[in-house]
Amino acid sequence: MIKKFCKKYKLPENTLHELLSHMAEVRFSKGELIISEGERNSNFYLLKKGIWRAYYLTDGTENSLWFAAPGDTAFSSWGYVDSEVSLINIESVNESIAYCISKPELEALFSHSIDMANFGRRIFEREILSVDSPQ
């Protein structure tokens, strides 16, 4: 998970270990919602174990948007960027473990380390690429 994450986001391992030292390990059960539609959640997650899925409901039908695997990040774009309620659900597909940090704590790290600030920029660059990628 560490090597995958560092390669994907071009982050030195020592910087990732610094980030992890500020994050809390959290566990989720199969089917548990990490973020619910209509909820405000500005936390930032790094998936250690398990699979997560983001989806929204249309007329009772679940429409999947993306899946996250170990080494991937996950967060509510609306909650993180604008402190708005989420328009999607993020669910743990199976038993999962993630690292979690609040937006204010993460932004404090960004302001104290150029490696962390660059990491933050790359996260959002990856988000833009995922939105623009043809399916």
Language model features by range: what are they?
Residues 1-135:
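Cytosolic regulatory regions built on CNB/CRP/Popeye-like sensor folds
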